[in-house]
Amino acid sequence: MKQLLFFFLLLLSFSHAKYMDNHSCNECHEKIYEEFQSSAHSHSYFTNTLHQQIADVVSKEKYSCATCHMPMADNIDELLSGEARPNKSNKTHTDGVSCFFCHTIAYVKRAHKFNINTKAKQAKGYKPTLYGRLAKPDDSDKHSSVSNPVYAKKVCMGCHSHKINDNNTTVFRAMDKKQDSVSCINCHMPEVSGGAEKMDKRARGQHASHKFLGIHDVEFRKTGMDINITVEDKKLNVMLKNKMAHPLIVQPARAKFLKIEISRTEKVIWKNYEKEPNEDKQGYFAYSYTQDKKEVIIPAHATANIVNNVEAESSKVLSYDTPSLQKGDSIRVGLYVQLAKSDCAKVIELDDSDLTKPQLMKEVVFIQD
């Protein structure tokens, strides 16, 4: 309770300190800076093509995504109101979800539409205070350091919990109301070798990875789902077990789907779709949206949605009618992801083929005895 009271007093009595850009962290936190540079958090409106195009379709005046995608903007109110636009010459705009922002969150306020990160105000004329989870953190000549209980359980909830639009339609949902950030940190920020600082004064020997591992990491994306195959006469059952603390599908632009093929002597004799993966309704996982009963791709103003999903830490069995199997027949089941589902091309230009190209998450093969 004393710690929480201390942080509230900070908010009431201090004003903003000078912004420390991402690169300034490199001097002491070289390894963490290197990890961060490869993460999604390092990307901004200017380097994330998909995000930029979607944001511009929603509005070419207001940058309503700034709250989470440009949180340290020194003119964030003007960006949200449409009085200003993202500026490539402004470091607080190009730093993405910056180191300084993530380490100056005082607390997270729960709200219906989206949770709110409240930034700590800093003592004017003094070096800034940065927060984290480490016990007895070290100060430096650039900043003071304080262990903040928010970073143990709540820090991810500000941006990664949920988003509901003005029509009370869910845009995305990764966490339920009872969840905290512990499982997020354990999976996406595992402990890796090396201290948090280059000097490692306290010989900690480990630090939380700042790669923020996710769908872009080939090895990491194999770990979230188990695929089990069983065959009964002319019935193929595929059980998907979601081991993650969030649903299989979170982002509205993304699609994940099953590609299933049965082969006999190297010839495909059955598959779950012919041309497009969404032909298999049960094996295609994505959000779809309507606005006043008309299909829309971008959900900013949607009035309803439908989602086929596998909920957090749950299983789903998909059943298919297939030909009778013979000895030696193989069943190949692959779970794929499209970072931008094909429908996105209806409303934005997707020159980056990697966004729509299906990428394998996990594959299993069953051979009939």
Where are these regions (language model features)?
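Short, conserved sequence motifs used for protein processing/export or organelle targeting and
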Residues: D180-S181, N186, P190-D369
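Sec-dependent N-terminal signal peptides
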Residues: L4-S13
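Hydrophobic alpha-helical membrane context
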Residues: F14-S15, R254
